[in-house]
Structure formats: C-alpha cells, structure tokens
Regions:
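Active-site-adjacent structural segments surrounding the nucleophilic cysteine of cysteine proteases
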Residues: 18-59
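Sec-exported extracytoplasmic/periplasmic mature domains
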Residues: 31, 35, 66-74, 81, ...
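Soluble non-cytosolic domains of exported or imported proteins
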Residues: 21-25, 52-63, 106, 125-128, ...
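Bacterial N-terminal signal peptides
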Residues: 7-15
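Acidic helix-start/capping segments at beta-turn-to-alpha-helix junctions
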Residues: 42-62, 75-100
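Positively charged n-region of N-terminal signal peptides that target proteins for export
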Residues: 1-6
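...with weaker cross-activation on analogous glycine-rich loops/strands in unrelated enzymes
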Residues: 27, 85-165
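Low-complexity, Gly/Ser/Thr/Pro-rich intrinsically disordered linker/tail segments
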Residues: 159-192
Length: 192
C-alpha cells in the first residue's frame, strides 16, 4: 500500500508540474506582445491558411490570444475553422455568412467563445482564486462589443486579483481590469 501511495504521489507531482509548465508559456507569449507597438485594427484581410496572421503591427483583442497560442504551437485559425466547417450551424450567425471564412472566423470573439464552449473549456466560478494564469476571459464592453483576454500570472498591487493581458484599443497591455466590464465567459483551454 505504501508503494502505491508513493507512485500515486509521484504521478500527481509530475502531472501537476506539467500542467504548470504549459501555462506560463502561454502567459509569457502574451506578455511578449505588450512590448510591441500594435495599432488596434480589426479590418478584414486575406491571410494565409494555416498559420495565417494579419500584420504583426496590427491587431485586436483576439489576435493577442491567437498569437499567444500560436507561439506555443496551437493554431486556433485551423482548430476554429475545422470545427466551424463540421458544425457551422452551431456557431453565431450574426455575420450572415453562408460558410466559414479562414480569414476572419477565428478573430471573432463570439466564434472563439463557441469554440471553447464546444471544446469543454468553460470554467465556472467568479472569485479571484478561480482565475488561473493562462485562463481566457471574455467580456461585453459598452456598445455590445465582445472582448477577450488572457489571465496573467501577476496580481494587482492592492489585492489578489490577477492582471489581464489584452488589447482593448491601445495595443497589448497587462492591466488590472478583470472586473471592469461584465464577464461573459471564463475558459481554460488545453488541446486534447
């Protein structure tokens, strides 16, 4: 019995440390973007597929997420497109498109929300401790504008509230804004 407990303990430590090691890479990739000047620009553009991206000096909130995941080897452009192609009727129809579009679908926050929901990544809970580094959060900004950001591994100066890495219009920033707008989603996405 003692031997089984030792193996179980080692397995838990290895599993936990592997999960921890993955998250900081995503946060680091997002934080790296805060060092670059990026003009907030959601203009439709034709981009390559797979691994397509708009110019690195342009982007919106979703581009912070897409670029961070891409830096750790996960191409959300492909994953979202493949799921939309197979399940187009389960995605938002607000754009009135007849089929998926690899140029823009992955850059739309409602599509990312649906993708993460379908991937089983939604997290419940709303206290500061429920938000872990690398988690994704979506908000609804004034004017019904959806927004997305990545939870940082850093905390605000006056509380245990985590900072958020996002682009709300002035380029990628790491800021204390988790509760600044109504939260519409909380996700912890890992590729299966």
């Amino acid at each position: 019995m003692k031997r089984i407990c030792q193996y179980l303990f080692v397995w838990l430590v290895v599993s936990f440390s592997s999960a921890i090691a993955e998250t900081p890479a995503l946060v680091s990739a997002a934080r790296q973007q805060t060092l670059n000047a990026v003009t907030y620009d959601g203009t439709y553009a034709r981009i390559a597929y797979p691994m397509g991206d708009v110019s690195s000096n342009r982007g919106v909130c979703s581009d912070v997420v897409i670029r961070a995941y891409r830096s750790i080897g996960i191409d959300l452009q492909v994953l979202v497109h493949e799921d939309m192609r197979a399940n187009f009727d389960r995605y938002p129809t607000v754009w009135h498109l007849p089929k998926p579009d690899t140029n823009i679908d992955h850059r739309r926050v409602p599509n990312l929300q649906r993708f993460f929901d379908r991937a089983g990544a939604r997290i419940t809970g709303s206290s500061d401790s429920d938000y872990k580094p690398g988690d994704l959060v979506t908000w609804m900004l004034p004017g019904n504008l959806p927004h997305i950001g990545i939870i940082s591994d850093r905390l605000s100066q006056n509380s245990d509230r985590p900072l958020v890495i996002h682009n709300i219009g002035a380029g990628p920033r790491e800021e204390d804004m988790l509760y600044s707008y109504p939260i519409t989603g909380h996700y912890r996405y890992k590729v299966q």
